[in-house]
Curated annotation (Swiss-Prot):
This is Uncharacterized protein y4kT. Signal peptide: none annotated. It comes from Sinorhizobium fredii (strain NBRC 101917 / NGR234). One of its GO terms (biological process) is diterpenoid biosynthetic process. Keywords: Plasmid, Repeat.
Length: 516
């Protein structure tokens, strides 16, 4: 084993051993801006405001120009926060640039709601528009009319409930609809819906009503969430936190995709996480965090991980989310998630359960090229494609898909990487390699040579970029805006590099295409 392989295993082991701190998530423009706005005084928060200003793009908006659908919430939120920070150098100019940006934007919600709309868009965007309207007067910015009936319907439902239980999914967007702090209660971590923005909004309302002990818990949560960004700037917070189920689940699942799940060098760290997941999985399943509502996606991936570790978890926890032959991520979901059903399919096949309907749904949701690109939790088509290939091949050693393979190889960029935006990313290149890893096992020699050539080009690209970045460069995960679960992404990057380094004549991937 060469030095780089040893280095990869060392870093993976270190990442896995850190996963008891609630998780690591990159900084969020939207949540930071909302927390600053709800926090009151600008004094003492200049560093966070400076960070917010530094994230503004040259066109006046916030968020990646590659993915315009996810720019509205951070831009609205930043504009509103900076509007009241006028004395700060650059704030007034930033507000003017943001206003011009919004005036130029086409409204993606003019007539319908896109399938991959950000989390809580129907509640958040109309609320932000309403706040901005009182500040900007007659500015002709997008009004998002298709979201208004959805928001109204949601508010009617919320109006019929005095208090939502801790961890309810709608609490994640409390900042967009909540006004009475008694209608929500901080969870055991001190958060409202594992959301810094929601918690900051709740805290601001609670302060006015004298809920001092609860305010202290919210403050402690916001400080811990800020540390989780690794930005080193007090007041800069992530889009979601904690993620103490999602982070370990997805990391171990990724190790499986790369054939690393059972690697002896990672055995102890994997066993610790598996034992924790086994103890936490109840009859209702698991959510992204211990104190958040269970969902089908986290439950399915947890079942996969436990079965891969030799446990025999009950499938009943997943059945709660089954409606007909589909799995909803959570009750009341606006539109079905392809990746949730991909993960459910993988879990069912690993557990030896019938899955014909789910398999048919996954197959039916390909694009004309045979890939999967209509995903609501990740902006890149490479994420659901890698996971779909693994799920469809599970238990079927001879599974082949020439159409998907051809499309995947054709999508490789001239530089050797893959990416859904204007540039290749390490994360997405790793997903491409995971898919090729599964496909390679059942290919004819000619196909394997084509795959090997693509992997060699990818390896050259990856070797020039494998050092860990100080902060995530390209958030690709869909929340209220695009965000980056730092460790989850880094595990994927390292696992992809490991695969590329060790490509060549080999046995099929650990667990890929074989029964457990």
């Amino acid at each position: 084993m060469n030095a780089l392989s040893e280095q990869i295993l060392f870093e993976l082991r270190h990442l896995l051993s850190e996963m008891s701190d609630g998780g690591s998530v990159g900084p969020s423009v939207y949540d930071t801006a909302r927390a600053l706005q709800f926090g009151g005084n600008v004094t003492g928060r200049q560093d966070a405001y400076a960070w917010l200003l530094a994230q503004q793009q040259a066109d006046g908006g916030w968020g990646s120009a590659d993915f315009p659908l996810f720019r509205h919430a951070p831009t609205w939120a930043a504009l509103l926060a900076l509007q009241r920070a006028d004395p700060l150098p650059g704030a007034a100019d930033a507000v003017q640039a943001a206003t011009r940006f919004l005036e130029r934007q086409a409204d993606p919600y003019a007539h319908a709601v896109p399938e991959d709309a950000p989390i809580g868009a129907e509640l958040i965007l109309p609320q932000l528009c309403g706040e901005a309207a009182s500040l900007l007067g007659g500015v002709a910015f997008p009004r998002h009319p298709a979201l208004l009936p959805l928001r109204q319907a949601c508010l009617v439902k919320l109006g019929a409930v005095a208090t939502l239980p801790s961890g309810h999914p709608l609490l994640h967007s409390w900042e967009a609809w909540g006004t009475w702090p008694t209608a929500a209660c901080p969870d055991d971590d001190g958060s409202i819906g594992i959301s810094p923005a929601a918690t900051a909004a709740w805290r601001a309302h609670a302060v006015t009503q004298g809920s001092t002990p609860q305010v202290g818990r919210a403050d402690a949560y916001l400080q811990a969430a800020s540390r989780a960004t690794r930005s080193g700037i007090e007041g800069v917070v992530p889009n979601v936190w904690p993620i103490n189920v999602f982070e370990p689940c997805w990391s171990l699942y990724t190790l499986h995709l790369a054939g690393l799940f059972a690697h002896p060098a990672l055995d102890e760290a994997v066993r610790v996480i598996v034992a924790q997941l086994d103890a936490r999985l109840g009859v209702r399943g698991l959510g992204p965090a211990l104190h958040f509502a269970a969902d089908a996606d986290d439950t399915a991936v947890a079942l996969c991980v436990l079965r891969l570790a030799g446990r025999d978890p009950a499938v009943d926890a997943l059945r709660h989310f089954e409606i007909g032959e589909l799995f909803v991520t959570f009750p009341g979901e606006r539109n079905a998630s392809v990746s949730t059903n991909i993960h459910a399919l993988h879990a069912l096949r690993l557990l030896g359960k019938p899955a014909a309907g789910t398999s048919a749904y996954v197959e039916a949701n390909r694009n004309p090229h045979g890939l999967w690109d209509n995903e609501k939790w990740h902006v890149s088509w490479l994420y659901p494609t890698a996971h779909a290939v693994a799920a469809l091949a599970q238990g079927k050693p001879q599974w082949r898909d020439e159409r998907a393979l051809a499309a995947l190889l054709q999508a490789q960029r001239d530089d050797g990487g893959w990416g859904a935006g204007r540039a290749s990313t390490f994360e997405e290149t790793a997903y491409a390699l995971f898919a090729l890893h599964v496909m390679d096992g059942s290919e004819e020699p000619t196909g394997r040579r084509r795959i090997a050539q693509a992997v060699a080009r990818a390896l050259e690209w990856m070797l020039a970029r494998h050092a860990a970045p100080a902060l995530p460069q390209m958030p690709l995960w869909i929340g209220k805006e695009l965000y980056c679960p730092i460790r989850v992404v880094r595990v994927a990057e390292l696992a992809g590099l490991w695969l590329a380094l060790r490509w060549g004549p080999r046995v099929p991937a650990e667990g890929a295409g074989a029964a457990p």
